[in-house]
Curated annotation (Swiss-Prot):
Highest classification ranks of the organism: Bacteria, Pseudomonadati, Thermodesulfobacteriota, Desulfuromonadia, Geobacterales
MF term (GO), any: structural constituent of ribosome
Protein name per UniProt: Small ribosomal subunit protein uS4
Keyword Ribosomal protein included in the entry's annotation: yes
UniProt source species: Trichlorobacter lovleyi (strain ATCC BAA-1151 / DSM 17278 / SZ) (Geobacter lovleyi)
InterPro entries hit by this protein: Ribosomal_uS4 (IPR022801), Ribosomal_uS4_bac-type (IPR005709), Ribosomal_uS4_CS (IPR018079), Ribosomal_uS4_N (IPR001912), S4_RNA-bd (IPR002942), S4_RNA-bd_sf (IPR036986)
Entry's Gene Ontology cellular component terms: small ribosomal subunit
Length: 208
């Protein structure tokens, strides 16, 4: 499956949920989901009954799009979560939340996950004292993420940090705004992830 390059707002409408793919725009009245709260397409406003499989598939698609992953990547995370001790669905969400690009977004250095991914790839961050350019790196408890000094005047990053108060920072993370430093205090558990996700539906889908 190729990476989606169409309008981001169509994805939010398709999943009937704000995926925050457009950064600050998603918090304004310009959000497409607020203006047209129905799926895109000619028959978007029509009602249709969805099967159990359809409900499970939509949940998987929603989470994939939320974190910006392709099917092969997402399945790899699921298989890894399934091999871990504990509840598979909760393990899956914890792995996704601990991706470096997601942590950069959660700390407020970027207004969207796609922007965070680009910043990581361009080498704007240091993880535990070493330059990190791989968005999928797993952040562990005790890890520190520091914005490189030469990047601290980037307008987009400053604007994102100023706006982070709007969505808040998860309890498992800590931000020192003055030092441009983030800390992973612990590994995220289900209670730390406020995004409305029914992960059990994904487990049921992949268990067929």
């Amino acid at each position: 499956m190729a990476r989606y390059i169409g309008p981001s707002c169509r994805l939010c409408r398709r999943e009937n949920m704000e995926l925050f793919l457009k950064g600050d725009r998603c918090y304004t009245d310009k959000c497409a989901l607020k203006r047209r709260n129905y799926p895109p397409g000619q028959h978007g406003q029509g009602r249709s009954k969805t099967s159990d499989y359809g409900v499970q598939l939509r949940e998987k698609q929603k989470v994939k799009r939320l974190y910006g992953l392709l099917e092969k990547q997402f399945r790899s995370y699921f298989d890894r979560a399934d091999r871990m001790k504990g509840v598979t669905g909760e393990n899956l969400l914890s792995l996704l939340e601990r991706r470096l690009d997601n942590v950069v977004y959660r700390l407020g250095f970027a207004s969207s996950r796609s922007e965070a991914r680009q910043l990581v790839r361009h080498g704007h961050f240091v993880l535990n004292g070493r330059k990190a350019t791989i968005p999928s790196i797993q952040v562990k408890a005790g890890d520190t993420i520091v914005l490189r000094e030469k990047s601290r005047n980037v307008a987009a990053i400053s604007e994102a940090l100023d706006a982070v108060v709007r969505r808040g920072i998860p309890q498992w993370l800590e931000l020192d705004r003055d030092a441009f430093t983030g800390l992973a205090k612990t590994v995220p558990v289900r209670e730390d992830i406020s995004t409305p996700i029914q992960e059990q539906l994904i487990v049921e889908l992949y268990s067929k």
